[in-house]
Protein backbone atom coordinates (compact mmCIF):
# COMPACT_ATOMS: atom_id res chain seq x y z
CA UNK A 1 0.00 0.00 0.00
CA UNK A 2 2.91 2.38 0.70
CA UNK A 3 4.27 1.77 -2.78
CA UNK A 4 0.87 2.52 -4.28
CA UNK A 5 0.64 5.74 -2.27
CA UNK A 6 4.04 6.89 -3.56
CA UNK A 7 2.94 6.03 -7.08
CA UNK A 8 -0.15 8.21 -6.79
CA UNK A 9 1.40 10.98 -4.70
CA UNK A 10 3.32 13.22 -7.21
CA UNK A 11 0.29 15.23 -8.29
CA UNK A 12 -2.45 15.32 -5.66
CA UNK A 13 -4.80 17.20 -7.98
CA UNK A 14 -4.71 14.28 -10.43
CA UNK A 15 -3.99 11.37 -8.14
CA UNK A 16 -6.98 9.41 -9.48
CA UNK A 17 -5.72 9.67 -13.09
CA UNK A 18 -2.96 7.07 -12.70
CA UNK A 19 -4.94 3.90 -12.05
CA UNK A 20 -4.76 2.39 -15.53
CA UNK A 21 -0.94 1.93 -15.59
CA UNK A 22 -1.21 -0.08 -12.38
CA UNK A 23 -2.85 -2.86 -14.40
CA UNK A 24 0.56 -3.56 -15.90
CA UNK A 25 2.39 -3.84 -12.56
CA UNK A 26 3.13 -7.41 -11.50
CA UNK A 27 2.85 -6.73 -7.74
CA UNK A 28 -0.80 -5.74 -8.20
CA UNK A 29 -1.69 -9.32 -9.12
CA UNK A 30 0.30 -10.63 -6.18
CA UNK A 31 -1.69 -8.36 -3.85
CA UNK A 32 -4.96 -9.37 -5.49
CA UNK A 33 -3.93 -13.00 -5.10
CA UNK A 34 -3.23 -12.53 -1.38
CA UNK A 35 -6.57 -10.80 -0.84
CA UNK A 36 -8.31 -13.56 -2.76
CA UNK A 37 -7.08 -16.11 -0.24
CA UNK A 38 -9.17 -14.45 2.46
CA UNK A 39 -12.42 -14.43 0.50
CA UNK A 40 -12.54 -17.10 -2.15
CA UNK A 41 -10.18 -19.22 -4.22
CA UNK A 42 -8.13 -17.15 -6.60
CA UNK A 43 -7.54 -17.97 -10.24
CA UNK A 44 -3.88 -18.45 -9.33
CA UNK A 45 -4.79 -21.28 -6.95
CA UNK A 46 -7.00 -23.03 -9.48
CA UNK A 47 -4.32 -22.64 -12.18
CA UNK A 48 -0.91 -22.88 -10.44
CA UNK A 49 0.95 -22.39 -13.70
CA UNK A 50 -0.21 -18.79 -14.08
CA UNK A 51 1.50 -17.40 -11.00
CA UNK A 52 4.76 -17.01 -12.92
CA UNK A 53 3.19 -15.72 -16.13
CA UNK A 54 1.85 -12.34 -14.99
CA UNK A 55 3.93 -9.69 -16.70
CA UNK A 56 3.42 -6.41 -18.49
CA UNK A 57 3.64 -8.05 -21.90
CA UNK A 58 1.13 -10.80 -21.09
CA UNK A 59 -1.41 -8.37 -19.62
CA UNK A 60 -1.12 -6.11 -22.66
CA UNK A 61 -1.68 -9.09 -24.95
CA UNK A 62 -4.69 -10.21 -22.93
CA UNK A 63 -6.31 -6.77 -23.10
CA UNK A 64 -5.57 -6.53 -26.82
CA UNK A 65 -7.07 -9.96 -27.40
CA UNK A 66 -10.20 -9.01 -25.46
CA UNK A 67 -10.75 -5.83 -27.48
CA UNK A 68 -10.07 -7.53 -30.83
CA UNK A 69 -12.61 -10.30 -30.32
CA UNK A 70 -15.41 -10.56 -32.83
CA UNK A 71 -18.32 -11.54 -30.62
CA UNK A 72 -20.54 -12.22 -33.63
CA UNK A 73 -18.27 -15.11 -34.73
CA UNK A 74 -18.10 -16.87 -31.37
CA UNK A 75 -20.11 -20.07 -31.19
CA UNK A 76 -20.96 -22.26 -28.22
CA UNK A 77 -18.14 -24.64 -29.10
CA UNK A 78 -15.59 -21.82 -29.32
CA UNK A 79 -16.34 -20.68 -25.77
CA UNK A 80 -14.80 -23.85 -24.36
CA UNK A 81 -11.58 -23.61 -26.34
CA UNK A 82 -8.36 -22.27 -24.91
CA UNK A 83 -7.91 -18.75 -26.25
CA UNK A 84 -4.56 -17.74 -24.78
CA UNK A 85 -2.02 -19.49 -22.56
CA UNK A 86 -4.43 -22.36 -22.06
CA UNK A 87 -7.25 -20.24 -20.61
CA UNK A 88 -10.70 -19.80 -22.10
CA UNK A 89 -12.66 -16.65 -22.78
CA UNK A 90 -14.03 -16.18 -19.26
CA UNK A 91 -10.79 -17.22 -17.57
CA UNK A 92 -8.47 -14.58 -18.99
CA UNK A 93 -11.13 -11.95 -18.40
CA UNK A 94 -11.13 -13.14 -14.82
CA UNK A 95 -7.34 -12.87 -14.61
CA UNK A 96 -7.49 -9.15 -15.37
CA UNK A 97 -10.66 -8.50 -13.38
CA UNK A 98 -8.96 -9.78 -10.19
CA UNK A 99 -6.24 -7.18 -10.54
CA UNK A 100 -8.69 -4.54 -11.74
CA UNK A 101 -10.94 -5.08 -8.70
CA UNK A 102 -7.98 -4.44 -6.42
CA UNK A 103 -6.95 -1.33 -8.36
CA UNK A 104 -10.34 0.41 -8.36
CA UNK A 105 -10.48 0.02 -4.57
CA UNK A 106 -7.31 2.10 -4.18
CA UNK A 107 -9.10 5.50 -4.08
CA UNK A 108 -11.38 4.19 -1.33
CA UNK A 109 -8.45 2.75 0.63
CA UNK A 110 -6.45 5.98 0.41
CA UNK A 111 -9.50 7.98 1.45
CA UNK A 112 -9.97 5.71 4.46
CA UNK A 113 -6.30 6.05 5.44
CA UNK A 114 -6.49 9.85 5.26
CA UNK A 115 -9.69 9.80 7.32
CA UNK A 116 -8.08 7.67 10.02
CA UNK A 117 -4.96 9.84 10.09
CA UNK A 118 -7.09 12.94 10.75
CA UNK A 119 -7.96 11.58 14.21
CA UNK A 120 -4.61 12.57 15.72
CA UNK A 121 -4.24 11.70 19.36
CA UNK A 122 -7.78 10.32 19.58
CA UNK A 123 -8.63 6.76 20.49
CA UNK A 124 -10.67 5.19 17.73
CA UNK A 125 -13.02 2.35 18.57
CA UNK A 126 -12.44 -0.96 16.87
CA UNK A 127 -14.13 -0.92 13.50
CA UNK A 128 -14.87 -4.66 13.54
CA UNK A 129 -17.55 -4.00 16.16
CA UNK A 130 -19.42 -1.96 13.54
CA UNK A 131 -19.10 -4.81 11.06
CA UNK A 132 -20.95 -7.29 13.24
CA UNK A 133 -24.47 -8.18 12.20
CA UNK A 134 -25.52 -8.40 15.83
CA UNK A 135 -24.49 -4.79 16.42
CA UNK A 136 -27.64 -3.75 14.54
CA UNK A 137 -30.13 -5.53 16.79
CA UNK A 138 -29.36 -3.58 20.00
CA UNK A 139 -29.98 -0.44 17.94
CA UNK A 140 -33.34 -1.81 16.81
CA UNK A 141 -34.17 -2.93 20.32
CA UNK A 142 -33.50 0.53 21.78
CA UNK A 143 -35.28 2.58 19.12
CA UNK A 144 -37.95 0.57 17.29
CA UNK A 145 -40.15 0.08 20.35
CA UNK A 146 -40.87 3.85 20.29
CA UNK A 147 -41.77 4.02 16.57
CA UNK A 148 -45.04 3.49 14.73
CA UNK A 149 -44.50 2.72 11.04
CA UNK A 150 -41.76 1.15 8.95
CA UNK A 151 -40.93 1.07 5.25
CA UNK A 152 -39.71 -2.35 4.11
CA UNK A 153 -37.59 -1.58 1.05
CA UNK A 154 -35.91 -3.79 -1.53
CA UNK A 155 -33.02 -2.08 -3.31
CA UNK A 156 -34.11 -1.39 -6.94
CA UNK A 157 -32.85 -3.76 -9.63
CA UNK A 158 -31.77 -4.44 -12.32
CA UNK A 159 -29.67 -1.39 -13.06
CA UNK A 160 -28.33 -0.40 -16.46
CA UNK A 161 -24.64 -1.16 -16.94
CA UNK A 162 -23.85 2.43 -17.87
CA UNK A 163 -25.27 3.58 -14.52
CA UNK A 164 -22.64 1.48 -12.74
CA UNK A 165 -19.89 3.15 -14.77
CA UNK A 166 -21.27 6.63 -14.09
CA UNK A 167 -21.45 5.83 -10.38
CA UNK A 168 -17.73 5.11 -10.27
CA UNK A 169 -16.87 8.27 -12.23
CA UNK A 170 -17.10 10.25 -8.99
CA UNK A 171 -14.35 8.11 -7.47
CA UNK A 172 -12.24 6.88 -10.39
CA UNK A 173 -11.50 9.72 -12.81
CA UNK A 174 -9.33 7.66 -15.12
CA UNK A 175 -10.99 7.41 -18.55
CA UNK A 176 -8.96 4.35 -19.56
CA UNK A 177 -9.95 2.47 -16.42
CA UNK A 178 -13.60 3.35 -16.95
CA UNK A 179 -13.45 2.13 -20.55
CA UNK A 180 -11.98 -1.16 -19.38
CA UNK A 181 -14.66 -1.39 -16.69
CA UNK A 182 -17.35 -0.80 -19.30
CA UNK A 183 -15.92 -3.60 -21.40
CA UNK A 184 -15.89 -5.97 -18.42
CA UNK A 185 -19.51 -5.22 -17.63
CA UNK A 186 -20.75 -5.82 -21.16
CA UNK A 187 -18.60 -8.94 -21.41
CA UNK A 188 -20.13 -10.51 -18.31
CA UNK A 189 -23.58 -9.26 -19.19
CA UNK A 190 -23.37 -11.22 -22.43
CA UNK A 191 -22.26 -14.27 -20.44
CA UNK A 192 -25.28 -13.77 -18.14
CA UNK A 193 -23.09 -14.08 -15.05
CA UNK A 194 -23.15 -10.54 -13.67
CA UNK A 195 -26.70 -9.84 -12.52
CA UNK A 196 -29.66 -12.18 -12.50
CA UNK A 197 -33.02 -10.44 -12.39
CA UNK A 198 -35.16 -13.53 -11.79
CA UNK A 199 -35.30 -12.93 -8.05
CA UNK A 200 -34.92 -9.96 -5.68
CA UNK A 201 -31.32 -8.97 -5.18
CA UNK A 202 -28.28 -9.88 -7.18
CA UNK A 203 -26.52 -13.09 -8.09
CA UNK A 204 -22.79 -12.76 -8.64
CA UNK A 205 -20.30 -14.91 -10.43
CA UNK A 206 -18.59 -17.21 -7.93
CA UNK A 207 -15.20 -16.65 -9.56
CA UNK A 208 -15.31 -12.84 -9.44
CA UNK A 209 -17.08 -12.08 -6.19
CA UNK A 210 -14.60 -9.39 -5.14
CA UNK A 211 -15.09 -7.48 -8.40
CA UNK A 212 -18.88 -7.79 -8.43
CA UNK A 213 -19.28 -7.03 -4.72
CA UNK A 214 -17.34 -3.82 -5.30
CA UNK A 215 -19.68 -2.81 -8.13
CA UNK A 216 -22.76 -3.73 -6.12
CA UNK A 217 -21.60 -1.79 -3.05
CA UNK A 218 -20.84 1.24 -5.22
CA UNK A 219 -24.36 1.07 -6.60
CA UNK A 220 -25.92 0.65 -3.13
CA UNK A 221 -23.80 3.53 -1.87
CA UNK A 222 -25.33 5.69 -4.59
CA UNK A 223 -28.84 4.45 -3.77
CA UNK A 224 -28.33 5.39 -0.13
CA UNK A 225 -27.28 8.91 -1.05
CA UNK A 226 -30.95 9.81 -0.82
CA UNK A 227 -30.83 9.14 2.93
CA UNK A 228 -28.02 11.56 3.74
CA UNK A 229 -30.43 13.96 5.37
CA UNK A 230 -31.15 11.49 8.16
CA UNK A 231 -29.82 12.40 11.55
CA UNK A 232 -27.11 10.64 13.50
CA UNK A 233 -29.58 8.15 14.97
CA UNK A 234 -29.21 6.21 11.73
CA UNK A 235 -27.42 2.89 11.82
CA UNK A 236 -25.79 1.43 8.72
CA UNK A 237 -23.96 -1.84 8.34
CA UNK A 238 -20.72 -1.63 6.45
CA UNK A 239 -20.60 -2.59 2.79
CA UNK A 240 -18.30 -5.40 1.82
CA UNK A 241 -15.55 -3.31 0.28
CA UNK A 242 -15.91 -0.03 2.15
CA UNK A 243 -14.73 0.75 5.66
CA UNK A 244 -17.47 1.48 8.19
CA UNK A 245 -15.79 4.64 9.42
CA UNK A 246 -15.36 5.91 5.87
CA UNK A 247 -19.06 5.38 5.16
CA UNK A 248 -20.12 7.30 8.24
CA UNK A 249 -17.79 10.22 7.44
CA UNK A 250 -19.19 10.52 3.91
CA UNK A 251 -22.72 9.98 5.22
CA UNK A 252 -22.65 12.84 7.72
CA UNK A 253 -20.74 15.10 5.34
CA UNK A 254 -23.42 14.74 2.68
CA UNK A 255 -26.12 15.13 5.32
CA UNK A 256 -24.85 18.56 6.37
CA UNK A 257 -24.48 19.70 2.78
CA UNK A 258 -27.95 18.56 1.71
CA UNK A 259 -29.62 20.16 4.71
CA UNK A 260 -27.98 23.46 3.72
CA UNK A 261 -29.30 23.11 0.17
CA UNK A 262 -32.85 22.33 1.26
CA UNK A 263 -32.76 25.11 3.83
CA UNK A 264 -31.85 27.60 1.14
CA UNK A 265 -33.96 26.46 -1.79
CA UNK A 266 -36.72 24.19 -0.50
CA UNK A 267 -38.13 25.62 2.68
CA UNK A 268 -41.52 24.00 2.18
CA UNK A 269 -40.30 20.39 1.97
CA UNK A 270 -37.57 20.70 4.59
CA UNK A 271 -39.81 19.32 7.34
CA UNK A 272 -39.99 15.98 5.54
CA UNK A 273 -36.22 15.48 5.78
CA UNK A 274 -35.71 16.64 9.35
CA UNK A 275 -37.85 14.08 11.11
CA UNK A 276 -36.02 13.57 14.44
CA UNK A 277 -37.48 10.07 14.85
CA UNK A 278 -36.38 8.57 11.53
CA UNK A 279 -34.10 5.52 11.59
CA UNK A 280 -32.52 3.59 8.74
CA UNK A 281 -30.90 0.15 8.62
CA UNK A 282 -29.69 -1.81 5.62
CA UNK A 283 -28.21 -5.24 5.04
CA UNK A 284 -27.67 -6.79 1.61
CA UNK A 285 -30.61 -5.82 -0.63
CA UNK A 286 -33.06 -5.11 2.20
CA UNK A 287 -33.58 -1.75 3.88
CA UNK A 288 -35.73 -0.59 6.78
CA UNK A 289 -36.85 3.01 7.22
CA UNK A 290 -38.82 3.48 10.45
CA UNK A 291 -40.46 6.61 11.83
CA UNK A 292 -42.69 7.80 14.63
CA UNK A 293 -44.77 9.72 12.11
CA UNK A 294 -48.15 8.96 10.66
CA UNK A 295 -49.15 6.76 7.75
CA UNK A 296 -49.46 9.87 5.55
CA UNK A 297 -45.84 10.80 6.25
CA UNK A 298 -44.59 7.30 5.38
CA UNK A 299 -46.64 7.36 2.18
CA UNK A 300 -44.91 10.61 1.18
CA UNK A 301 -41.56 8.96 1.84
CA UNK A 302 -42.56 6.01 -0.31
CA UNK A 303 -43.40 8.09 -3.38
CA UNK A 304 -40.36 10.30 -2.84
CA UNK A 305 -38.03 7.28 -2.92
CA UNK A 306 -39.77 5.80 -5.97
CA UNK A 307 -39.50 9.06 -7.93
CA UNK A 308 -35.91 9.64 -6.83
CA UNK A 309 -34.67 6.20 -7.90
CA UNK A 310 -36.60 6.29 -11.17
CA UNK A 311 -35.13 9.65 -12.15
CA UNK A 312 -31.63 9.06 -10.82
CA UNK A 313 -31.08 5.54 -12.18
CA UNK A 314 -33.40 5.68 -15.20
CA UNK A 315 -35.19 2.48 -14.26
CA UNK A 316 -38.78 1.43 -13.74
CA UNK A 317 -39.07 1.04 -9.98
CA UNK A 318 -42.36 -0.48 -8.88
CA UNK A 319 -44.06 0.75 -5.74
CA UNK A 320 -44.62 -2.87 -4.75
CA UNK A 321 -40.97 -3.10 -3.68
CA UNK A 322 -41.71 -0.68 -0.81
CA UNK A 323 -44.28 -1.72 1.79
CA UNK A 324 -45.66 0.41 4.63
CA UNK A 325 -46.26 -1.66 7.74
CA UNK A 326 -47.31 -0.85 11.26
CA UNK A 327 -44.70 -2.06 13.71
CA UNK A 328 -47.19 -3.35 16.26
CA UNK A 329 -49.08 -5.49 13.70
CA UNK A 330 -46.34 -6.80 11.46
CA UNK A 331 -43.39 -9.19 11.72
CA UNK A 332 -40.47 -8.85 9.33
CA UNK A 333 -37.73 -11.20 8.30
CA UNK A 334 -34.41 -9.44 8.69
CA UNK A 335 -30.98 -11.13 8.68
CA UNK A 336 -32.38 -14.53 9.56
CA UNK A 337 -34.48 -13.28 12.50
CA UNK A 338 -38.23 -12.78 12.64
CA UNK A 339 -38.49 -9.42 14.41
CA UNK A 340 -41.57 -7.56 15.59
CA UNK A 341 -42.75 -4.98 18.11
CA UNK A 342 -45.54 -6.34 20.28
CA UNK A 343 -47.51 -4.97 23.19
CA UNK A 344 -46.59 -6.62 26.47
CA UNK A 345 -49.51 -6.12 28.92
CA UNK A 346 -48.72 -5.75 32.60
CA UNK A 347 -50.97 -5.30 35.64
CA UNK A 348 -49.96 -2.87 38.39
CA UNK A 349 -51.65 -2.47 41.76
CA UNK A 350 -51.61 1.09 43.07
CA UNK A 351 -52.83 2.39 46.39
CA UNK A 352 -53.76 5.93 47.32
CA UNK A 353 -54.58 6.39 51.00
CA UNK A 354 -57.14 3.69 51.78
CA UNK A 355 -58.19 3.06 48.20
CA UNK A 356 -56.39 0.55 45.97
CA UNK A 357 -56.94 0.08 42.26
CA UNK A 358 -55.47 -1.84 39.33
CA UNK A 359 -53.82 -0.19 36.33
CA UNK A 360 -53.34 -1.97 33.00
CA UNK A 361 -50.17 -0.92 31.19
CA UNK A 362 -49.16 -2.03 27.71
CA UNK A 363 -45.41 -1.77 27.15
CA UNK A 364 -43.96 -2.14 23.66
CA UNK A 365 -41.26 -4.79 23.45
CA UNK A 366 -38.95 -5.59 20.53
CA UNK A 367 -38.98 -9.34 19.87
CA UNK A 368 -36.52 -11.38 17.83
CA UNK A 369 -37.62 -14.93 17.10
CA UNK A 370 -36.20 -17.89 15.21
CA UNK A 371 -38.20 -18.58 12.01
CA UNK A 372 -38.61 -22.30 12.60
CA UNK A 373 -40.38 -23.26 9.36
CA UNK A 374 -37.82 -21.69 6.96
CA UNK A 375 -34.98 -23.00 9.14
CA UNK A 376 -36.35 -26.56 8.97
CA UNK A 377 -36.65 -26.03 5.22
CA UNK A 378 -32.93 -25.20 5.09
CA UNK A 379 -32.13 -28.33 7.12
CA UNK A 380 -34.28 -30.40 4.77
CA UNK A 381 -32.51 -28.92 1.76
CA UNK A 382 -29.19 -29.91 3.34
CA UNK A 383 -30.54 -33.46 3.89
CA UNK A 384 -30.59 -33.35 7.69
CA UNK A 385 -34.35 -33.92 7.96
CA UNK A 386 -37.54 -34.13 5.95
CA UNK A 387 -39.68 -31.11 5.11
CA UNK A 388 -41.81 -32.00 8.15
CA UNK A 389 -38.78 -31.88 10.46
CA UNK A 390 -38.20 -35.63 10.92
CA UNK A 391 -34.44 -36.32 11.27
CA UNK A 392 -32.79 -38.50 8.61
CA UNK A 393 -29.27 -39.77 8.09
CA UNK A 394 -26.64 -37.99 6.01
CA UNK A 395 -25.27 -40.74 3.70
CA UNK A 396 -22.66 -38.43 2.17
CA UNK A 397 -20.80 -38.27 5.49
CA UNK A 398 -20.91 -42.02 6.16
CA UNK A 399 -17.36 -42.49 4.89
CA UNK A 400 -15.92 -40.13 7.51
CA UNK A 401 -14.63 -41.22 10.89
CA UNK A 402 -16.97 -41.20 13.88
CA UNK A 403 -15.20 -38.23 15.46
CA UNK A 404 -15.41 -36.21 12.24
CA UNK A 405 -19.13 -36.93 11.86
CA UNK A 406 -19.88 -35.94 15.45
CA UNK A 407 -17.68 -32.85 15.14
CA UNK A 408 -19.44 -31.67 11.96
CA UNK A 409 -22.92 -32.05 13.41
CA UNK A 410 -21.87 -30.48 16.70
CA UNK A 411 -20.22 -27.53 14.96
CA UNK A 412 -23.35 -26.83 12.91
CA UNK A 413 -25.47 -26.92 16.07
CA UNK A 414 -23.12 -24.64 18.01
CA UNK A 415 -22.93 -22.15 15.14
CA UNK A 416 -26.72 -21.95 14.92
CA UNK A 417 -27.01 -21.42 18.68
CA UNK A 418 -24.30 -18.77 18.47
CA UNK A 419 -26.03 -16.91 15.64
CA UNK A 420 -29.50 -17.11 17.23
CA UNK A 421 -28.27 -16.22 20.72
CA UNK A 422 -30.35 -13.04 20.51
CA UNK A 423 -33.64 -14.89 20.17
CA UNK A 424 -36.37 -13.95 22.65
CA UNK A 425 -37.60 -17.55 22.83
CA UNK A 426 -34.92 -20.21 22.55
CA UNK A 427 -37.23 -23.23 22.84
CA UNK A 428 -37.20 -23.41 19.04
CA UNK A 429 -33.43 -23.90 19.03
CA UNK A 430 -33.75 -27.05 21.13
CA UNK A 431 -35.93 -28.55 18.42
CA UNK A 432 -33.15 -27.80 15.93
CA UNK A 433 -30.64 -29.41 18.31
CA UNK A 434 -32.87 -32.50 18.53
CA UNK A 435 -33.01 -32.76 14.72
CA UNK A 436 -29.24 -32.45 14.31
CA UNK A 437 -28.41 -34.79 17.18
CA UNK A 438 -30.77 -37.53 15.97
CA UNK A 439 -29.59 -37.04 12.38
CA UNK A 440 -26.04 -37.52 13.64
CA UNK A 441 -27.06 -40.70 15.47
CA UNK A 442 -28.83 -42.05 12.36
CA UNK A 443 -25.75 -41.31 10.24
CA UNK A 444 -23.47 -43.16 12.66
CA UNK A 445 -25.91 -46.05 12.99
CA UNK A 446 -26.08 -46.30 9.19
CA UNK A 447 -22.30 -46.39 9.03
CA UNK A 448 -21.99 -49.18 11.65
CA UNK A 449 -25.08 -51.04 10.36
CA UNK A 450 -26.83 -50.90 13.71
CA UNK A 451 -29.93 -49.30 15.19
CA UNK A 452 -30.11 -45.80 16.61
CA UNK A 453 -31.13 -47.11 20.03
CA UNK A 454 -28.07 -49.36 20.22
CA UNK A 455 -25.71 -46.61 19.20
CA UNK A 456 -27.16 -44.08 21.66
CA UNK A 457 -26.78 -46.56 24.51
CA UNK A 458 -23.13 -47.07 23.60
CA UNK A 459 -22.09 -43.42 23.15
CA UNK A 460 -24.97 -41.29 24.39
CA UNK A 461 -22.96 -39.15 26.84
CA UNK A 462 -20.22 -38.41 24.31
CA UNK A 463 -22.76 -37.36 21.72
CA UNK A 464 -24.53 -35.13 24.26
CA UNK A 465 -21.33 -33.32 25.28
CA UNK A 466 -20.46 -32.54 21.67
CA UNK A 467 -23.79 -30.76 21.16
CA UNK A 468 -23.48 -28.53 24.22
CA UNK A 469 -23.24 -24.84 23.33
CA UNK A 470 -20.53 -22.61 24.77
CA UNK A 471 -22.95 -20.99 27.24
CA UNK A 472 -24.19 -24.38 28.46
CA UNK A 473 -20.62 -25.63 28.90
CA UNK A 474 -19.66 -22.61 31.01
CA UNK A 475 -22.72 -22.96 33.23
CA UNK A 476 -22.36 -26.72 33.62
CA UNK A 477 -18.66 -26.49 34.53
CA UNK A 478 -18.83 -23.41 36.75
CA UNK A 479 -22.16 -24.14 38.41
CA UNK A 480 -22.84 -27.90 38.37
CA UNK A 481 -26.08 -27.28 40.22
CA UNK A 482 -26.99 -24.01 38.61
CA UNK A 483 -29.96 -22.24 40.05
CA UNK A 484 -32.93 -21.19 37.98
CA UNK A 485 -31.72 -17.58 38.02
CA UNK A 486 -28.42 -18.53 36.35
CA UNK A 487 -30.18 -20.47 33.64
CA UNK A 488 -32.46 -17.47 33.25
CA UNK A 489 -29.39 -15.43 32.32
CA UNK A 490 -28.59 -17.96 29.63
CA UNK A 491 -32.15 -17.78 28.30
CA UNK A 492 -31.88 -14.01 27.91
CA UNK A 493 -30.82 -12.40 24.64
CA UNK A 494 -27.09 -12.21 23.96
CA UNK A 495 -25.66 -10.20 21.05
CA UNK A 496 -22.16 -11.08 19.83
CA UNK A 497 -19.80 -8.73 17.96
CA UNK A 498 -17.89 -11.47 16.14
CA UNK A 499 -20.60 -12.40 13.62
CA UNK A 500 -19.87 -10.81 10.24
CA UNK A 501 -22.18 -12.79 7.96
CA UNK A 502 -25.50 -14.60 8.05
CA UNK A 503 -25.32 -18.27 8.97
CA UNK A 504 -25.53 -20.45 5.85
CA UNK A 505 -28.61 -22.27 7.15
CA UNK A 506 -30.23 -19.03 8.34
CA UNK A 507 -29.77 -17.44 4.91
CA UNK A 508 -32.64 -19.47 3.46
CA UNK A 509 -33.91 -16.91 0.94
Swiss-Prot record:
It is found in: Plastid, Chloroplast. Keywords: Chloroplast, mRNA processing, Plastid, RNA-binding, tRNA processing. It comes from the Eukaryota. GO terms for biological process: mRNA processing; RNA splicing; tRNA processing. GO terms for molecular function: RNA binding. InterPro entries: Domain_X, Maturase_MatK, Maturase_MatK_N. Signal peptide: none annotated. Pfam families: Intron_maturas2, MatK_N. The keyword Magnesium does not apply. The keyword Plastid applies. One of its GO terms (cellular component) is chloroplast. Usually encoded in the trnK tRNA gene intron. Probably assists in splicing its own and other chloroplast group II introns. Belongs to the intron maturase 2 family. MatK subfamily. PANTHER family: MATURASE K. This is Maturase K. It comes from Nicotiana rustica (Aztec tobacco). The gene is matK.
Amino acid sequence: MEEIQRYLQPDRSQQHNFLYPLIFQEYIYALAHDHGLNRNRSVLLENPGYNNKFSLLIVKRLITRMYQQNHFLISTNDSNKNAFLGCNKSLYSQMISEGFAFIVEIPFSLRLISSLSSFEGKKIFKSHNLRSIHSTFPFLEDNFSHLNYVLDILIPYPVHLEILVQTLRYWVKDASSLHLLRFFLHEYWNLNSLITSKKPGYSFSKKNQRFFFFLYNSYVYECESTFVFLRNQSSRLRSTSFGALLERINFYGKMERLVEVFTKDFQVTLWLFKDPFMHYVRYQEKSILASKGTFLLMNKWKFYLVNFWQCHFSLCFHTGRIHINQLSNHSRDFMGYLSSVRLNPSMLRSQMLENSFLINNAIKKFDTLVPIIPLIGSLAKANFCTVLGHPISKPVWSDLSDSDIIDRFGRICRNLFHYYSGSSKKXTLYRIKYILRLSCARTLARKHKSTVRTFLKRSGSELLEEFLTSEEQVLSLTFPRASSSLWGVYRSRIWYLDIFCINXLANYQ
